[in-house]
Amino acid sequence: MNKTGNEKSTFTLAYFSTLLDGYNLTVSAPLIVILSRFMNLSLLDTALLASSALIGNAVGGFLMGRLPDRFSRKTLLIVDLLLYAVMGLFSSLSITIAQIIIFRMLLGIGIGGDYPNSSSLLAEIQGNTGRGKSVGFLGTSWTIGFGLSLLVGLLLYPLGPDAWRILLFLPVISSVVIIILRSHLNESTPWKKSREVAKRDNVRRIFSKELRVFTIYVTTFWFFFDAIHYGISEYAPLVMKTIGLHGNTTGIIASLILASVEVIGTLVGISLVDREGRRKVQIIGFLGISVSMLVAAFVTQEYVLIFVLFALGEFVGFGPGILEFIYPPEMFPTELRGTGAGFANSMSGVGAVIGVLIQPFILGLSNGVTYLFLMYAGMAFAVLMLTIAIAPETSSKAVITEMPEIQ
């Protein structure tokens, strides 16, 4: 399918906004490391700093995911970015830890709306051929944003006590540019055709008998995947210290390498996801995560463990790292697409928050690292079994534009 200039711009801006999503959702890891140099952060401070944007993401996915179905894909794409540009600015100007937490929580609400809206819009524009690759590249963009947050944090670490302000302010500039460019985009044609239908109670409809299995699957896999992924990415410095690797920036460096491996994994995944199918890629991804976490639980040599974690990154990117963007918009019709993807993103945010909040307490236990990796292995294995049992294959199907009346 040959894209028009407007469609190419839509894809490009979606990729860049998702890159900013990845940056903003994972910047807490270097933020905590930098703040710890100059402040005595409590365990509660650390947990709330790590989870604040994720909490907002969970709320935003539910509240703002529904709005594009009712009002406008284009308008909400601008509102989402405007919200987290403003809150990103306020975060960088904060004078207390509490203010950083509150503003980043509000920033997360904007991210929660951008996630489902961007993937829904791209799925509606892209034809059946190559849809997985085009939409899946959002996963690559997100992971690049993850890596950039770590790289910027690493570069800013040697600077003075205000380095964290620069870390939080940099995405604001890019957000403003994307907002201006998005204002010139066209509205989604499938959405314009379905807008009257979308005025119904969409949350209830995604649990109708026609869509219930899709909703259960996509929310469950995304919930557990984000619990694992954010639990590891947000606390990599703490994990590295616990397994015996010290140094103020060791965790950031390890996470940066992990993010680089994930990028490679996403590129491999999107090269196969249309040809081999969604189910096969997802199964391989969660199988790899399960095995990696199980091996990590019983490895005692620090550097072997790091190698295992890098293998984990490859499988994370290969499977769920791209399918969290591909699957949701393919499972719901146009009038429910933002609602369904938004609800799934909201539940993934809940999983991410749980993963982030419980990890410091587990690591504080004797043999805490072993328990942590065993827990993650169990989560991944449960999703693997669920995928084998009920995950649909959507690669050869056109995106659903409408469906029969749902009671």
Where in this protein do the model-derived segments appear?
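Cytoplasmic helix-loop-helix junction between adjacent transmembrane helices
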Residues: F103-T140
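Paired small-residue
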Residues: L83, M87, A98-L106, L305-L312
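Helix-breaking motifs and short loop linkers at transmembrane-helix boundaries and internal kinks
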Residues: N40, S72, L93-Q99, G127, ...
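Conserved MFS/SLC helix-loop-helix module at the cytosolic interface between two early adjacent transmembrane helices
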Residues: V59-I97
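Glycine-rich segments within core transmembrane alpha-helices of 12-TM secondary carriers
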Residues: G130-G153, S174, N345-G355
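Extracytoplasmic
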Residues: S9-L43, H229-P237
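Extracytoplasmic gate region of multi-pass secondary transporters
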Residues: S28-A29, E210-T266
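Symmetry-related core transmembrane helices of the 12-TM Major Facilitator Superfamily/SLC fold
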Residues: R165-I180, L372-A389
